[in-house]
Amino acid sequence: MAASIIPKEVSLDETGHIKLFNKFPFEGVEVKDISLVDYITIGNGQPLPHTAGRFQTKRFRKARCFIVERLTNSLMMNGRNNGKKLLATRIVKHAFEIIALLTDQNPLQVLVDAVAACGPREDSTRIGSAGTVRRQAVDVSPLRRVNQALALITIGAREAAFRNVKSISECLAEEIINAAKGSSNSYAIKKKDELERVAKSNR
């Protein structure tokens, strides 16, 4: 990308690439879970997680959507938060700043590790007609693993921040750090373990 067409507000790293929120580089971020490589998009040098719904026009296209934008969109899931993209983006930005301070790592890498760690690999589904219904354990597709991981992370952060002195940004940062470590203090990890335990009993 030619330097002349990049606005002066956008800062570049040493290699001339754009940084997320003008602070966090995309370079060196990798998905360690081989099954999720095609479903966690690190980003293609966009300073803000906003593509104006470009990835919702076709089914399954959201798999190519930048993972930070998907996290931002998940924060808007409750009815009263619908459409507040600017607020959600600000929450994610502050959460990333907190993660960078607490871990001394790139927050993008921490988020990718958290999503890979708290997506359930096995779930249970209902099988049978109205008369006899039983539950059967099934494998979870990689896209659904990412979807559920993002939903669980944001639900955990929202519940932790409710009636709490801590802000939603602090709770989101804490949730992402705990999920990346695989800690049982994370709401997402606890829910994932619960789903997998129920699925195991229904094999």
Curated annotation (Swiss-Prot):
Question: What processes in GO biological process is this protein linked to?
Answer: cytoplasmic translation; ribosomal small subunit assembly; translation
Similarity comment: Belongs to the universal ribosomal protein uS7 family.
Q: Pfam families this protein is in?
A: Ribosomal_S7
Give this protein's Gene Ontology molecular function annotations.
mRNA binding; rRNA binding; structural constituent of ribosome
Assembly mode: Component of the small ribosomal subunit (SSU). Mature yeast ribosomes consist of a small (40S) and a large (60S) subunit. The 40S small subunit contains 1 molecule of ribosomal RNA (18S rRNA) and at least 33 different proteins. The large 60S subunit contains 3 rRNA molecules (25S, 5.8S and 5S rRNA) and at least 46 different proteins.
Q: What is this protein called?
A: Small ribosomal subunit protein uS7B
Q: Which UniProt keywords apply?
A: Cytoplasm, Ribonucleoprotein, Ribosomal protein
Q: Which Gene3D superfamilies match?
A: Ribosomal protein S7 domain
Superkingdom of source: Eukaryota
Ribonucleoprotein recorded as keyword: yes
Question: What does the function comment of this entry state?
Answer: Component of the ribosome, a large ribonucleoprotein complex responsible for the synthesis of proteins in the cell. The small ribosomal subunit (SSU) binds messenger RNAs (mRNAs) and translates the encoded message by selecting cognate aminoacyl-transfer RNA (tRNA) molecules. The large subunit (LSU) contains the ribosomal catalytic site termed the peptidyl transferase center (PTC), which catalyzes the formation of peptide bonds, thereby polymerizing the amino acids delivered by tRNAs into a polypeptide chain.
Q: Which cellular component terms (GO) are annotated to the entry?
A: cytosol; cytosolic small ribosomal subunit; ribosome
Its UniProt miscellaneous note says: There are 2 genes for uS7 in S.pombe.
Q: Which gene encodes it?
A: rps502
Q: List locations, semicolon-separated.
A: Cytoplasm
CDD domains registered for this protein in UniProt: uS7_Eukaryote
Source organism of the structure: Schizosaccharomyces pombe (strain 972 / ATCC 24843) (Fission yeast)
